[in-house]
Amino acid sequence: MAGGRLGPTVTLYDSADFGSLHLSNRVVMAPLTRTRADAEGVPTAIIEEYYRQRAGQGLIISEGVWPVLEGKSYPGQPGIVTPAQIEGWRRVADAVHAEGGTIVM
C-alpha cells in the first residue's frame, strides 16, 4: 500500500501481530457481560456457542471472570478457579480456535 507522512496505510482487515498473537484482522471484540454461566460459575454451552459465532473477529476479549472464589460479583458470572470452570473455558477456547479465532481473558 502507498505510504504517507505517517507511514504505510493499514486497514481494519489487515492482519496484525502482537507479541506471540497473530490476528487475522484488527477487529477487537470488547468484553461484554453475558451472565450465562451456571450457578457454580461454569461456562455453559450457550457461552461456548456465543464465542464460537464471533470467532471471525481479529481478537475476542472474554467477559469478566472471577479469578478467586471471593471475586464473584453477580449471578451468572463465570469463574476460572475450579477444574470444572477451567474445563468450561477450555471448551470455549477450543471452539473459537476451531473457527480460526483468537480469544484472551
Predicted segments, located by residue:
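Flavin-dependent oxidoreductase catalytic cores
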Residues: 1-104
